[in-house]
Amino acid sequence: MQRNNRLRNLFTVPVIMARQLKRNALSAGLAFAGNATSNEFDEHLQNEVEREREIQKKKKIKRTQSKKSPDLINKSTFQSRTIGSKKEKHRQLDPEYEIVIDGPLRKIKPYHFTYRTFCKERWRDKKLVDVFISEFRDRESEYYKRTIENGDVHINDETADLSTVIRNGDLITHQVHRHEPPVTSRPIKVIFEDDNIMVIDKPSGIPVHPTGRYRFNTITKMLQNNLGFVVNPCNRLDRLTSGLMFLAKTPKGADNIGDQLKAREVTKEYVAKVVGEFPETEVIVEKPLKLIEPRLALNAVCQMDEKGAKHAKTVFNRISYDGKTSIVKCKPLTGRSHQIRVHLQYLGHPIANDPIYSNDEVWGNNLGKGGQADFDIVITKLDEIGKRKPAKSWFHSNGGYGEVLRQEKCSICESDLYTDPGPNDLDLWLHAYLYESTETEEGTEKKKWCYKTEYPEWALRR
């Protein structure tokens, strides 16, 4: 009961005070950006939390029941043994692979791999060859056509051809000679570890889990290789974002941290280095976000009545300004994909080395300020990056070197080869430096837990 009251107070106080805060914004030194009032947003957030509480309540009942049959859970894979046995036939098997540390880069030597995946919703009722060409952009269309014609792609264990259409529930199997992109060789720092969870400081430039072209150059696979067992991520960080990550070592750890994050019982703070002179007063952005292009992970500010729109709110405070860039503390009150990056772009202060949201060749001179952009043009230009053009940003405006096609093919699979990644491919000046429980120890004001990293070097003014 005491816990519920604390949660209720956390979200009802802003609702009661929202109108007064809005009236006093100028005198209090606050700036608001958004169409919806704080009142409307906080009411939505409270409803979201209440729904999540009900979900967690039902989950806890199921957990209590499952404790009576502990052998039903496979602790090494976090799966029900019954479900796991049904999927055993389709389990993704890892081949042997070799790691090479080449100065600042961690490389994986090319290896043979059987890629297995079930049909995604956006692939339904589309030709297999069209999905390969549009979704997996690291290879040219002729490679995929040749691979399908050679019989190296199967749908539900049957050989596919160029006319094959993917249906809901289809299992796609693709035999491939895999070339993973290099990632940074910076070490993964462990901040905290017990029997159930591990808290790490994730380096920039490494994906969290296998996705797209990455498998063994990912946080979960690196740790699995070092630890000898599976760890599951509890919070999300973009590939380029660095900072605090929670990884569950057991189902108990996954449930504990996951439930707190979903119920908004965690305060998160980031630090970013942005373009220009950020306002000295606190800035609050309440603008919905939506995914514009899944292949490019492109997100944008939108109206709440648009399909796919999600409420989003971020609080910003300037730490310092050096005449060109500002160091800003960012506090997301929701956890939408690219939320901080897009809200900063909306304000006209994108992250200074952001290869997506601070590239003037893509967004024009205003860098997408106010959400103003022709997204058909934006998507077309972003599509060229990493193939014909290296990634660039406001800070690295000349582009310089980076990952592009190098006009050379693999002697084994004849796929196009790429140059090594550059600074815009590996680094982003956005760092998650603090995660803290919103709840306190009984009878004290001390938070139940708090994890913190040092500021990254780029955030330290000399």
UniProtKB/Swiss-Prot annotation:
Keyword vocabulary terms for this entry: Isomerase, Mitochondrion, RNA-binding, Transit peptide, tRNA processing
Pfam families per record: PseudoU_synth_2
An MF annotation (GO) of this entry: tRNA pseudouridine(32) synthase activity
Superkingdom in the source lineage: Eukaryota
Cellular component, GO, one term: nucleus
Catalytic activity: uridine(32) in tRNA = pseudouridine(32) in tRNA
Extent of the transit peptide: 1-24
Enzyme superclass (EC): isomerase
Biological process, per Gene Ontology: enzyme-directed rRNA pseudouridine synthesis; tRNA pseudouridine synthesis
Family statement: Belongs to the pseudouridine synthase RluA family.
Function: Responsible for synthesis of pseudouridine from uracil-32 in mitochondrial transfer RNAs.
Protein known as: tRNA pseudouridine(32) synthase, mitochondrial
Native source species: Saccharomyces cerevisiae (strain ATCC 204508 / S288c) (Baker's yeast)
